[in-house]
Amino acid sequence: CKSIMQSSSNLFPVALISAERRGDLSEDVYRLKPGNSPDGTVELAVTRLGLADVPENRGTPVILLHGSFSNRRFWYSPKGIGLGAYLARRGFDVWIPEMRGHGLSKRNQAYARNRVADYARYDLPAIGAFVREQSAQIPHWIGHSLGGTTLAAALGGQYLGAPAVASVALFGCQVSRNYWPLKIPPVEWGGRFILKRMAEVSGARFKRGPEDEPVGVLIETMRWHGLFGRFGDTERDWWKGLADVDVPLLAVSAAGDHQDPDW
């Protein structure tokens, strides 16, 4: 069904924008408009996967967060391949959000200024609340690359916690790697100056992935790695806040991952 259908939620406006059968899987795509951030134009697309022949027999909810320059297709290809499809076929209730301006999530008005801080403070709590409402269960969260970093920020900033998170799995993400050139203030300042002249960085042009990234995320990352930088925002130190988080955690890294290498 291609037309926009109303979906029931007591949290904020939600529309079911498509409901399709994809082989042995069901694919429902929701558009969330939480209205909880300073930019009221933010809308988030969330894809729900399940077994087509048993639509009412939903299992344990799992939320999959994609990385930078990516979208839902990292987890679930058009041919039904990927971890999202794998988990759905094994009875899990799979939810795949797409970050602002990625995939089916349209660009918000302040797209260029989007930051991990915004995703962590506003978007992930709204997504988590919607999944809990629809599934009546506490979801497990899996994050890859920037998705995992955003999830860690939400936990360290106390925006997500045990009442909303059954467990966390982080794949190929880190914030502790040193980028020594960024410790030299003129280098960091020069990088920021160049980036501020842009709205986004093209994933296709730089062969990073199918999506663009807002320049705000890159400037924020440079600040984390600057001379006096920290993993946090002006209000909270997310790194220190992680010490107070009490949820089951699985962290996976690989020696062959040169961008987010194994310790």
What are the language-model segments listed below?
Residues 11-54:
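N-terminal cap/lid segment of alpha/beta-hydrolase-fold proteins
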Residues 53-104:
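Short, surface-exposed "cap/lid" segments of acyl-processing enzymes
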Residues 66-67, 87, 96-98, 140-153, ...:
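Catalytic nucleophile loop
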Residues 113-132:
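Alpha/beta-hydrolase active-site loop
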Residues 133, 137, 141-142, 146-233:
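Alpha/beta-hydrolase-fold enzymes
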Residues 237-244:
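The feature captures the conserved acid-bearing segment of alpha/beta-hydrolase catalytic domains
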Residues 245, 251-253:
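Short beta-strand/loop motif that positions the catalytic acidic residue
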Residues 258-263:
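Conserved alpha/beta-hydrolase "acid-adjacent" motif
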